[in-house]
Amino acid sequence: MIWTDTFANNKQSNIFSTELGENNARLAMLNRQDIRVIVGNPPYSVGQESANDDNQNDHYEELDARLAATYVQETASSNKNKLYDSYIRAYRWASDRIGNQGVIGFVTNAGWLDSSSADGMRKCMTEEFNSIYIYHLKGNARTQGIQRQKEKDNVFGEGSRAPVAIVFLVKNPKSSDYGKIYFHAVGDYLTREEKLAALKWDRSIAYTPMNVIVPDAHGDWFNQRDDSFSHFMRMDGKKTKEVAIFKDYSLGVNTNRDAWVYNSNRQTVINSTKRSVLAFNKALGELNSGLDTSSVRQKYIKDVAWSSSLVSRLERKIPSDFSERRIQKSLYRPFFKQNLYFDPESGFTHRPGRWKYIFPDSKAKNLAICSSGVGSKEYSCLMVDHIPCLDFLEKTQCFPRWLPGEQTKGAEDTLDFGEPSEMPSGFSQEALPHFQAAYPGKPITEDDLFYYIYGILHSEDYRMRYANNLMKELPRIPRVATYEQFMAFVEAGQELARLHVHFEDVAPYAGVKFEYTKVGQPSYRVTQMKWGKIKGKTGNAAKDKTTLIYNDWITVKNIPLEAQEYVVNKKSALDWVVERACVSIDKASGIVNDFNDYAAEMGSERYPLDLFLKIITVSLETMKIVKTLPKLEIHPLDK
């Protein structure tokens, strides 16, 4: 046995060099060997979840330089951090260690096989290896719905959430083939025991039927894209020379301390944020008195949710301040609003994105189309009139109609946004003429274009045809065949926007029946809504989504099942209300988030119940509009 840090390029610590001389002698001997076979189960770790963990990944200068020159350099993704995951480092290290000949056999996280961020890694694999054999064991616990059922158990048990694959990589200098990919996956719905039995039965890749995979030009091995998508105008214009529809866009806001700065109760946001800002400034004083940064952070860990941006501010000894003016409404999850302390300058909003230009403060009037981001497993979009959280949708990216913050750069204290028509447009100069060119002589405004985009993004034809593209890149918008079709999408987009932005103003669904379990004036306070129960297909209890147990007083019946068809961010809109409209306590901070407080701010104790009934209406009306959208026919200019 040899003790070593494999990735450290054989540079041992003082402990190894002074106490384990014999160990180092064996290591030196190993390093002189011509290694041709490497087998292992590398760990999966991309980094700490919070700066409070104080547990950052090690950095390996030489190995990470090789990663940067290969997998990172070849990727088209802007999210390069995931390429420094330990198991991906292991692939890079092993690929170099065997030189120009050998075999690697790894049991690893299977995420790299189809993730958008690993496209460069896959390209390098096909260039460096003659043959690649993949035995996919599924088990991805991060999926939902039917796909989650298909993935079923993980071969490593319930403690692992990542999909697993056995991968063999072969370098053979005598072979004329390069990048041949052979693939086999276990069946759907298999338990852990059934997957292990399948492995035992197959015994070897020599006896296992394999499909040949041919990569596409994007480096995709699975879920390959429709290349006609590239003919359409892209929505995003950053980091590309292509002309785009929007001149600016933003990720949803990433606070890295949601429990502290989001809450149903405005006063709770004030109290918790003040407490944290005061503690941070006290921590600065401790730093000035001689304590090191790590010790200071640990001392104030109960009062400050540390993030890398706030740690950087601490190290630079820059104090923070607090102002109630920075509190505004935010869409935390679909159809679920919260009070947010948004401060892009103080470090207490970890990744503020471009929101100071889109929604500079609570008075700013604007609209933004939110879209699932790159790497999302299922496409969704939703229009908002407030700042959304990063997890509002999956990896939320937002495209604004206007940019009110652009007209007042450097003038925060005198903001006067006026009417939306007076604000700088969010569209590029090329966007409107591009679409007008398809329908000469026909009137099209920027407002038309904005709602047209929203209508197109709801087209079931569009989502199905370009599903693989939408998992791996942000949307592109086609021009439809006729002006009449264009205007049909505009009108649908307007109606959808009215429902989704003004969901609190729609009429509550009137077709339900209320049952009261107690005598007297009912209470509308909510603790945690839950669906009723029925006997499922297998005999076990299943959710009855025609019945809602609102609280101990009220049960709602006759909820139309069709309302469940409207799915946004992998759940029905109603499921989001049931999950989020509750009383919760953050374990780390002890902060209570009571949705009844939000109801009080809205002036109605029954706000949570009315919200549920309104989202029934929103769901039914949305699906009615979506199902009547025109068939997606592409204009000749985009073919």
Residue ranges of predicted features:
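Conserved residues in the N-terminal Rossmann fold of short-chain dehydrogenase/reductase
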Residues: 2-5
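SAM-dependent methyltransferase catalytic-core segment centered on the flexible catalytic loop
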Residues: 7-106, 111-115, 124-134, 430, ...
